[in-house]
């Protein structure tokens, strides 16, 4: 599952977002095992919707890009959780396009390697070409420090923990 975030410069109530989603074919998820309350399905394609995402972790560079593309500060965030099933990304694009036609919006693909902020025109181009929201990431090589041939990648915190454990082990041996 891959999350993307719809961001609009309009302050939209949760009820208004849900009304729009229901008009677009999104349904309330009734499963007792659900993670999110809303879902849209078409064949194998599935997109879960979190209509009132309240988690926002500031990133000044990305926030400035979003605000610049929106033409104002972000007000409402809606997260689409895209299944990896065939057709799910196109279904998410359709929903995002309709959302962006209704309210001034951008879509953040939340990709760590190739993060992009898409406006309505960008979304329509991707959809018409049959491309996905992470096409850029497919051609981006992993940074060299992440993976060196023949070496296991250890995050800095893992190295620090191993060094700490090694010091403790050596102290016990003495």
Q: Model regions: which residues?
A:
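Short, intrinsically disordered low-complexity segments
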Residues: 15, 24-90
């Amino acid at each position: 599952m891959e999350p993307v975030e719809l961001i609009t410069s309009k302050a939209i109530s949760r009820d208004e977002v849900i009304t729009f989603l229901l008009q677009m074919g999104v349904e309330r998820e009734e499963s007792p095992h659900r993670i999110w309350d809303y879902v849209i399905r078409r064949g194998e394609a599935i997109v879960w919707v979190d209509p009132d995402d309240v988690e926002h972790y500031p990133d000044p560079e990305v926030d400035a890009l979003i605000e610049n593309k929106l033409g104002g500060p972000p007000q409402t965030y809606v997260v689409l959780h895209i299944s990896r099933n065939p057709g799910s990304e196109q279904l998410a694009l359709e929903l995002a396009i309709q959302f962006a036609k209704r309210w001034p919006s951008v879509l953040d693909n939340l990709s760590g390697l190739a993060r992009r902020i898409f406006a309505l025109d960008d979304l329509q181009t991707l959809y018409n070409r049959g491309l996905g929201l992470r096409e850029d990431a497919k051609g981006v090589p992993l940074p060299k420090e992440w993976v060196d041939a023949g070496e296991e990648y250890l995050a800095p915190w893992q190295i620090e923990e191993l060094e700490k454990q090694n010091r403790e082990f050596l102290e016990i041996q003495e």
